[in-house]
């Protein structure tokens, strides 16, 4: 895999795709689904205030719906996103 390192206060995230079904059990195609807003952090750029920023590689996050720049790496979808567009960290 090509290594992508985000510059500045940005993250490289991989959207978590969830299979969507209707109540009747019909699987919806990607074009009919709402854009996912959950992702896994793949890489972290240089964060100025590391002590207040508690997100690291492997964490799952919720991000703003239309934020970031979508890119493809080895036929996989990723997003480069500003840290301010991360809304929450998911703890399981």
From Swiss-Prot:
Pfam families named in the record: Cpn10 (PF00166)
Keyword vocabulary terms for this entry: Chaperone, Cytoplasm
Keyword Chaperone listed: yes
Cellular compartments annotated: Cytoplasm
Binding partners and assembly: Heptamer of 7 subunits arranged in a ring. Interacts with the chaperonin GroEL.
Record-stated family: Belongs to the GroES chaperonin family.
HAMAP family with a match to the protein in the record: CH10
Protein's recorded name: Co-chaperonin GroES
